[in-house]
Amino acid sequence: MRRVIAQGTFDILHPGHVHYLSDAASLGDELHVIIARGENVTHKPKPILDGRQRRDMVAALDVVDEAHLGHVEDIFVPIEEIDPDVIVLGYDQHHDEDGIKAALDARGIDCEVTRATPRELRHDDELLSTGRIIDRIVERRC
């Protein structure tokens, strides 16, 4: 059984998230998704929804076998527990593949690290980013 991990914030689910997770699921038999805890999100604004809500939404997607909240102090703990064959990064996630691979190697975790493919726009006004969705909400509702 080939075990795959995808990870992210997943605040306000959108078609880009669904594509990422579907792409990741296609690379194995079992997809585990690690949901970043709000306190660990440092590269962009903190999530609007709490971790449990984001985890439950991701878990409801058919392609996801299990959704996990990330560890409060050490983002690699869930990876060690799941013991994946491959970690799939989002095509535009800020993580450095080589840096992740080096950190995994240092912990004795032997798995492939790859990137998901980008999702092509299907409509001119399609939004594939939580930030752009929030901008549109502010523009139209405030």
UniProtKB/Swiss-Prot annotation:
EC number: 2.7.7.2
Binding residues for ATP: T9, F10, H14, P15, G16, H17, D92
InterPro entries listed in its UniProt record: Archaeal_FAD_synthase (IPR050385), Cyt_trans-like (IPR004821), FAD_synth_RibL (IPR024902), Rossmann-like_a/b/a_fold (IPR014729)
Pathway listed: Cofactor biosynthesis; FAD biosynthesis; FAD from FMN: step 1/1
GO molecular function: ATP binding; FMN adenylyltransferase activity
One GO process term, biological-process aspect: FMN metabolic process
Keywords: ATP-binding, FAD, Flavoprotein, FMN, Nucleotide-binding, Nucleotidyltransferase, Transferase
Record field: catalytic activity: FMN + ATP + H(+) = FAD + diphosphate
The keyword Transferase appears for this protein: yes
Cofactor(s) demanded: a divalent metal cation
Keyword Thylakoid (UniProt): no
The protein's role, per its UniProt record: Catalyzes the transfer of the AMP portion of ATP to flavin mononucleotide (FMN) to produce flavin adenine dinucleotide (FAD) coenzyme.
Alphabetical list of PANTHER family matching this protein: FAD SYNTHASE
Family statement: Belongs to the archaeal FAD synthase family.
Quaternary structure note: Homodimer.
This protein's name: FAD synthase
The encoding gene: ribL
